[in-house]
Amino acid sequence: MGMNRRTFLSYLATLSALPLLPASFAYAFDRIAGRFGPVPEPSDIQRVISAGPPADLLLLALAPEKLLGFSSFDLSGETGALFSETVRRLPRLGRLSGRASTLSLEKLLTLNPDIIIDCGSADETYRSLAQRTSQQTGVPYVLVDGGLQDTPTQLRQVGQLLNVTTRAGLQAQFADAILQRANAYRTNAQTEKPRFYFARGAMGLETGLRGSLHTEAVELLGFENVATAGELKTLTQVSMEHILRWNPDLIITQDVQSYQNITHSEQWQSVQAVAQQRVILMSGLPFGWLDAPPGLNRLLGLCRLQSHFDPVAAQQLKSDTRTFFHLFYHTDLDDAQLELLLRVA
C-alpha cells in the first residue's frame, strides 16, 4: 500500500530525532550562484521556467504547481506511470543552453514566465548564458550551483525564493539525513570502498571522470573512480584498453543495453568486476538514479547504491524510497510499484 498520513508523520518524527546540521550551517554557503535581472518577490512568482534537466527535478520537487513544463522530460507516456496525472500533464518545453537550446526565446516569451531557474554547473559559461538570456528577454534568471552535498541548501534557498519554505524544509531535512548516512559510510574505515567504473551509453564506453557531477554520488560513499584525466572533471569516451588497464572491481550502469553488453560481451569478461559478477544495473525511472541528470534524483540513487553494501541502508531502502517519492515527486507508491522500481539486476 502507499504511505498513509500516520506512517508519514511517524517517519518524520523519527527523522527529526536525527543529529541534523543546524540551519545556520546550511545557509553558511549561498548556493544561488547568480541572479540576473530583478528577481520578483517570492509571493509574485507563479510561473517558472526550468532551463535544464537538474532544474526540472528541483522544481518538480519544490513547486510543481508553478512549473510551466519540463525542459527535457516527457512523462505523458508509460515512462511517467509512477507519477501523478498532474505531473504527467506537464509538457516538455525544451532546454535553454545557448546554441544547443531547444526552447527558442520567442517561445519562451509566449509562456510569460516570472522567472527562469537553472541548476547544475555554475561556471562562467553558464553564468554568461544566464545573463545573456535575461538581457534578451527581460525575464529574471537564477542560476543554482548543483553540487549533491549542497542539495539541502539548494532546497531551502530556492524554496524561499519560490515561497514554499515549509515544503522545502521537509525535503531539506530528509536530504540532510541521506547525506549524513552516506558521509558516515565513507568515513567508516570498516566499510567496503570498491574501485568502480561508471558505464554510460549503449556500449558502456562513456563515463564521468573522477570529481565530475556525473560520478559525484558514487564517490560520496568513498568509492574510488578509476577514470581519471588530470584536472578534467567531465564526461569522456574511453576504450576497452582503458578499462582493461583500470580493471575495476565494481561496474555501475543505468542503461539496460549497456548492462547486457558488459555482462555478455566476450571482451568484457576479463575485467575483474565482470568476472566476479559485480555489475550493478540501476534502471526503472524515466531519468537516472545516479546521473542523467546530475540533480537531486541522485539522493535516492545514493540510498539504493549504499543498500548494496550496507545492511542498515538495505533495511531502510523501501521506506526511504516511499518517503522520497512522497516528498520530492508528490507520489505515494503502492507495493507493486515499489517492488518493480527496486528490482535487482
Please place each PLM-identified region on the residue numbering.
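A short, structured surface patch at a secondary-structure boundary
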Residues: 55-110, 115-124, 226
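A ligand-binding cleft/hinge motif common to bilobed small-molecule-binding domains
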Residues: 123-134, 253-269
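Ligand-binding pocket segment of bilobal, Venus flytrap-like solute-binding proteins
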Residues: 227, 234-258
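N-terminal export signals
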Residues: 7-28
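Short helix-initiation/N-cap motifs at beta->coil->alpha
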Residues: 34, 93-105, 231-240
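Alpha-helical, coiled-coil/dimerization segments enriched in small aliphatic residues
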Residues: 207-234
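Extracytoplasmic substrate-binding proteins
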Residues: 29-32, 38, 115, 127-206, ...
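C-terminal segment of N-terminal export signals and the immediately downstream linker at the start
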Residues: 2-3, 22-40, 48
